[in-house]
UniProtKB/Swiss-Prot annotation:
Organism: Arabidopsis thaliana (Mouse-ear cress)
Cofactors named for this entry: Mg(2+)
Transit peptide: 1-32
SUPFAM superfamilies recorded: Terpenoid synthases
InterPro entries: Isoprenoid_synthase_dom_sf, Polyprenyl_synt, Polyprenyl_synt_CS
Protein name: Solanesyl diphosphate synthase 3, chloroplastic/mitochondrial
Catalyzed chemical reaction(s): 5 isopentenyl diphosphate + (2E,6E,10E)-geranylgeranyl diphosphate = all-trans-nonaprenyl diphosphate + 5 diphosphate
Binding site for Mg(2+) 2: D181, D185
Length: 422
């Protein structure tokens, strides 16, 4: 597989170079930096929650001239056309059935509230579950030494069920966060249908979210792996932190690209990255492989949200399932506007007045149209997609065709994230 091998040769440089993960100082003179979450030291925890700080260019000594051209190669050099979702379709069906079983409750209204959102908000493509199921295969499951004496087939099957459990837990956490977000944002719709807080009220929406989190906690405990519990607990904490950052930001923070990227990691990428790492941990993989799984999820999540922020300006209400321009109308400043402000500083004053005078939205759009804001945000998303693909290319080589196919599918997802229109 030409593309994956070429990515592996390039990306192995940043895996061997510990400073890429372990220090922001070594890259301080370049427009790329990595900062750790609070509570983790750079030297002893190189993979627990790094946040891209200002990833405008990857032309650092670590990467040489490796820029977003790699992404373009990914779509042309993959050996065969793959549909990542069809590869795991059967398991996605099992996962959906299991989720329906898990949200049953003694109080019928609580169960129906959770079921309402799963039917309308989760079923579709099941993006996060697809990533995690593909990652489980891509990591080429190796049986932990403690279980060597048992039947390999049985252990592998049980391990797959446990890994699928990570996908189920991740979906419940994700949906719970959406239920709570809709209350905080006073949202009317979600993916084109009435949001639960509108249909059943804020109280029931909050309780349904809490209920899903409690079921996720129970499922996590059943895995009996404290490292996995810590990873998913961190992701939940980050969801809360990111939302808090959005609603409590100062004026300067609101217009800071660093702040925006950190908030984006917390709100979107942390759950994907920590879940990917949890899948690796359950397989008994090495720390280096766990880092690669984490980095894939982190960068794919960042790319996904950057494109989402672009689509808020370029998409339509029908295709996005939400009102177009919803971010700027609610005072949420995203990458396209931040980049546009670098060219037109006067845009900041216009955006400041949007909530007082909605007519300023049109003025802001005029500035955005004259700027390279959309283009630069897309380039930044492409760079993160490239890093995600590079992480997969750095996984240990294998002759297993299923593993190769899953890795190609994960790379294909980086392409789909960038080219999606909804």
């Amino acid at each position: 597989m030409l593309f994956t091998r070429s990515v592996a040769r390039i990306s192995s440089k940043f895996l061997r170079n510990r400073s890429f993960y372990g220090s922001s100082q070594s890259l301080a003179s370049h427009r790329f930096a990595i900062i750790p979450d609070q509570g983790h030291s750079c030297s002893d925890s190189p993979h627990k929650g790094y946040v891209c700080r200002t990833t405008y260019s990857l032309k650092s000594p670590v990467f040489g001239g490796f820029s977003h051209q790699l992404y373009h190669q990914s779509s042309s050099l993959v050996e065969e056309e793959l549909d990542p979702f069809s590869l795991v379709a059967d398991e996605l069906s099992l996962l959906s059935n299991k989720l329906r079983e898990m949200v049953l409750a003694e109080v019928p209204k609580l169960a129906s509230a959770a079921e309402y959102f799963f039917k309308r908000g989760v079923q579709g493509k099941q993006f996060r579950s697809t990533i995690l199921l593909l990652m489980a295969t891509a990591l080429n499951v190796r049986v932990p030494e403690a279980l060597i004496g048992e039947s390999t087939d049985i252990v592998t099957s049980e391990l797959r069920v446990r890994q699928r459990g990570i996908a189920e837990i991740t979906e419940m956490i994700h949906v719970a966060s959406l239920l709570h977000d809709d209350v905080l944002d006073d949202a009317d719709t979600r993916r084109g249908v009435g949001s639960l807080n509108v249909v059943m009220g804020n109280k029931m929406s909050v309780l349904a979210g809490d209920f899903l989190l409690s079921r996720a906690c129970g499922a996590l405990a059943a895995l009996k792996n404290t490292e996995v519990v810590a990873l998913l607990a961190t992701a939940v904490e980050h969801l809360v932190t990111g939302e808090t950052m959005e609603i409590t930001s100062s004026t300067e923070q609101r217009y800071s690209m660093d702040y925006y990227m950190q908030k984006t990691y917390y709100k979107t990428a942390s759950l994907i990255s920590n879940s990917c790492k949890a899948v690796a941990v359950l397989t008994g993989q090495t720390a280096e492989v766990a880092v690669l799984a984490f980095e894939y999820g982190r960068n794919l999540g960042l790319a996904f949200q950057l494109i989402d922020d672009i689509l808020d300006f370029t998409g339509t209400s029908a295709s996005l399932g939400k009102g177009s321009l919803s971010d700027i109308r609610h005072g949420v400043i995203t990458a396209p506007i931040l980049f546009a402000m670098e060219e037109f500083p006067q845009l900041r004053e216009v955006v400041d007045q949007v909530e007082k005078d909605p007519r300023n939205v049109d003025i802001a759009l005029e500035y955005l149209g004259k700027s390279k804001g959309i283009q630069r945000a897309r380039e930044l998303a492409m760079e993160h997609a490239n890093l995600a693909a590079a992480a997969i290319g750095s996984l240990p080589e294998t002759d297993n065709e299923d593993v190769k196919r899953s890795r190609r599918a994960l790379i294909d997802l980086t392409h789909r994230v960038i080219t999606r229109n909804k």
